[in-house]
Regions:
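Mixed-charge interfacial surface used for oligomerization/domain docking
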Residues: 2-23, 29-39, 43-184
């Protein structure tokens, strides 16, 4: 996977540029989770932390980053074998939106089945309320990833910005990309 490729690249770069350091950390994350994590690590670098201190912070804090996902379309869950055709049909008829997150090993785990887009948007923000450092006083950054659903992403971002008035800037919305989109 990505971490193995990064380790191979680090070894090749170490041979070619022996005076430079490349350290690899498995963030156990994905998509904008990587981006948010790297943004924090760049801040530490800019504060004058050594590469080893940044790596140590990354390893100690990688599980503090929360990834929550939802989908309003069950088609690809059926095609990917995650749910049966019957479950997909009934879930679609009942407007079920699965809410998932990532466990401590980076695997996607279904957590809840929620009826309706509005309800799942409310719940995903409640999850941020439950997990954000400092609760509603959270003053870090927030990234949202989406795939062809800008209106839904904007609805989540607006609610996050309303509930967390001390965010460091506006919520950043990004596309998840085809690899992550097809995997989930």
């Amino acid at each position: 996977g990505s971490v193995s490729s990064a380790r191979i690249a680090a070894e090749e770069l170490a041979e070619k540029y022996p005076d430079n350091k490349v350290l690899v950390v498995d963030s156990l994350g994905a998509s904008s989770g990587y981006g948010l994590f790297m943004d924090k690590l760049a801040d530490l670098r800019d504060e004058g932390k050594s590469i080893e201190e940044v790596r140590d912070f990354a390893e100690a804090n990688r599980l503090h980053l929360h990834h929550w996902f939802f989908s309003t379309d069950l088609t690809f869950y059926v095609r990917g074998g995650r749910i049966s055709k019957a479950a997909g049909w009934f879930g679609t008829a009942l407007k079920i939106c699965p809410l998932l997150n990532m466990d401590d090993e980076g695997h996607l785990i279904p957590r809840q089945k929620i009826r309706g887009k509005k309800a799942v948007i409310q719940q995903i923000v409640k999850e941020m309320e439950n997990h954000a450092q400092g609760g509603h006083d959270y003053n870090g950054k927030c990234f949202i990833s989406m795939s062809a659903c800008m209106d839904d992403a904007r609805a989540v971002a607006d609610l996050v910005e309303e509930k967390f008035p001390h965010l460091n800037g506006k919520v950043m919305i990004n596309n998840i990309g085809t690899t992550i989109g097809s995997h989930t």
